[in-house]
């Protein structure tokens, strides 16, 4: 089955208010104790796969999870192992009759003979209830607890919105209502990813790089644009999560900047490919990207002018300015306004209701190319040598 959910982090000052909104009297509370398994080389996590056994109340459930087509979608296979006095042994034979689960494990493990060993555990108290919104059932789960290894632990306090029935569009609209009320910020990192980092004594996963996109000849222009933006969000959001959590490295900031540049170009060049594209999106993304450019300019001055001048006051001021720019950027990427932008683009990229177009993809591609060439030629023609003096 495919699980559709969004996860958000909650500012400490808004946690009690969110718990009240969930209303514990109307909610269920369950203790979830999970054990996560992988090989010594982390072959499963390298392929975006998680394998766990979790005690849910009195029953043990073995779950296989894998990345899906977007940050909302995940493959999930659950198997009820029953009520047991002790934690059960890991059992891979339960996947023998599920072709998709078998393929996921085969792709990750290949021919490895490495045994699957316990890597980390989670101990979570979940307060949850199903809320109806626009004829859609959404399970809201507040998870509070910790992830731990034999030598380290980390607190967890997050909220998940899972689609139980209805439309993805309603799930996204519902999520944004909670984002506005409780200043939630989108976090595409899973508990498995956080646990693996803790087990490896690392703060953050490597920065996500862009993947090459190929237009699909069999699909219309409006669908191709949705697919392109979906892929660019796959590039952007993991890097944004690292910045939001204040654990990012230089590469995360650079890759987020590249992803925003790609999104800005896509929304500017191909806006006529889909009637649902808003003119404001490119402007919003462009303004957002300027904050990354500002940090880049400061860092460039530090490594060039600052290094050359060797002035202690200049060096100190540049260091302070860069630190301030990074703090401002971390606040900006998790701001309600920008989380709204992410959700708006996600909503657009996942919409499946395409309007019939009177022209095929080739016509749109040729038309866009001709228009861009004309703009470039007009710009070159109007340029005078004095413009560069």
Predicted regions and their residues:
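Function-determining surface determinants
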Residues: 1-389
């Amino acid at each position: 089955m495919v699980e559709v959910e969004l996860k958000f982090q909650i500012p400490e000052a808004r946690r009690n208010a969110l718990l009240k909104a969930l209303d514990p009297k109307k909610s269920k509370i369950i203790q979830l104790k999970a054990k996560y398994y992988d090989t010594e080389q982390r072959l499963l996590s390298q392929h975006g796969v998680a394998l766990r056994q979790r005690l849910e109340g009195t029953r043990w459930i073995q779950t296989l999870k894998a990345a899906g087509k977007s940050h909302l979608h995940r493959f999930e296979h659950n198997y009820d192992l029953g009520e047991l006095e002790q934690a059960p042994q890991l059992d891979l034979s339960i996947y023998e009759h599920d072709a998709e689960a078998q393929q996921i494990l085969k792709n990750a493990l290949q021919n490895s003979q490495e045994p699957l060993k316990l890597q980390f555990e989670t101990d979570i108290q979940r307060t949850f209830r199903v809320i109806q919104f626009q004829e859609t059932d959404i399970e809201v789960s507040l998870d509070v607890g910790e992830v731990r290894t034999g030598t380290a632990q980390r607190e967890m306090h997050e909220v998940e919105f899972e689609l139980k029935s209805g439309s993805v569009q309603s799930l996204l609209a519902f999520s944004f209502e909670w984002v506005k009320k409780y200043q939630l910020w989108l976090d595409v990192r899973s508990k498995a990813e956080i646990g693996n980092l803790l087990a490896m004594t690392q703060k953050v996963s490597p920065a996500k790089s862009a993947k090459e996109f190929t237009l699909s000849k069999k699909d219309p222009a409006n669908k191709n644009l949705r697919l392109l933006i979906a892929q660019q969000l796959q590039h952007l959001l993991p890097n944004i999560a690292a910045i939001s959590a204040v654990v990012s490295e230089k590469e995360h900031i650079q890759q987020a900047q590249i992803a925003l540049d790609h999104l800005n170009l896509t929304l500017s060049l191909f806006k006529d490919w889909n009637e649902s594209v808003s003119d404001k999106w490119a402007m919003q993304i462009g303004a957002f990207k300027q904050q990354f450019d500002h940090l880049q300019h400061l860092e460039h001055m530090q490594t060039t002018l600052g290094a050359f001048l060797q002035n202690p006051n200049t060096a100190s001021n540049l260091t302070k300015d860069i630190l301030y720019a990074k703090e401002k950027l971390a606040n900006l990427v998790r701001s309600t306004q920008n989380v709204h932008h992410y959700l708006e683009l996600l909503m657009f990229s996942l919409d499946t209701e395409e309007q019939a177009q009177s022209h095929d993809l080739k016509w749109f591609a040729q038309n866009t190319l001709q228009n861009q060439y004309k703009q470039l030629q007009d710009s070159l023609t109007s340029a005078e040598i004095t413009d560069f003096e």
